[in-house]
Amino acid sequence: MPRYFDGDFLPPKGRFAICVARFNGFITEELAKGAVDTLVRHGVADADIDVYRCPGTYELPGLVRRVTETRQYVGVITLGAVIRGGTPHFDYVAGECAKGIGAVAFEAAAATPAKTVTFGVLTTDTVEQAIDRAGVKAGNKGAEATLACIEMVNLYAKMSATDGRKA
C-alpha cells in the first residue's frame, strides 16, 4: 500500500516572515494584510510573525535569502506587485524576481531543517488587475501565498517525521 503525504491547514508550529516590496504599496499593503490575517486565522500568534519591507520586487530575492539564512522561520511569504508599463522594465524585474525567489525556495527546501518560501508577487498588465488580485474581486493573492506556505510547512514537518531529518 503506498504512503501518501499531504500538507494541511492545521496550526503550524514555528515562526513566519512576510517579505513585502514597498513599490506599488497601495497594492502590496493589501497583500500583506491578507497574509497576516491568514496566519492569525490559522493559529499563528502575532509574536511569531515578522514583516520585512524592501524598496521593490527586484530587491525581494536578496531579502528573502537573508531572512531564510537566519534560520528563525519555518516559512517565508514573498509579496510584491509588478505592473506592465510601456517599457521592457516589467519583463526584467518580474523575471529576475521570480528566478531569484525560486532559487532561494529551492535552497531553503533542501536545507536542514527545511524551510518553505512561497511566491505571492503579482505580475499584471494593468493596475486594475493588480487591485482585483489584492482583494477587491479575485481574492487576495497574499492570503493564497500564505495558505500555500502553511500547507508546505506542515508537509515538510510530516516528511521530516518519517525521513529522520529535523523539521
Curated annotation (Swiss-Prot):
EC number: 2.5.1.78
Top-level EC class: transferase
Gene Ontology biological process: riboflavin biosynthetic process
One GO cellular component term: cytosol
GO molecular function, one term: 6,7-dimethyl-8-ribityllumazine synthase activity
A Pfam family it matches: DMRL_synthase
Pathway where this protein functions: Cofactor biosynthesis; riboflavin biosynthesis; riboflavin from 2-hydroxy-3-oxobutyl phosphate and 5-amino-6-(D-ribitylamino)uracil: step 1/2
Keywords: Riboflavin biosynthesis, Transferase
Annotated binding of 5-amino-6-(D-ribitylamino)uracil, by residue: F23, T57, Y58, E59, A81, V82, I83, F119
Residues the entry annotates as binding (2S)-2-hydroxy-3-oxobutyl phosphate: G86, T87, R133
Catalytic residues identified in the record: H89
UniProt cross-references to NCBIfam families, sorted A to Z: lumazine-synth
UniProt function note: Catalyzes the formation of 6,7-dimethyl-8-ribityllumazine by condensation of 5-amino-6-(D-ribitylamino)uracil with 3,4-dihydroxy-2-butanone 4-phosphate. This is the penultimate step in the biosynthesis of riboflavin.
Protein family (similarity comment): Belongs to the DMRL synthase family.
UniProt protein name: 6,7-dimethyl-8-ribityllumazine synthase
Organism: Myxococcus xanthus (strain DK1622)
Gene that specifies this protein: ribH
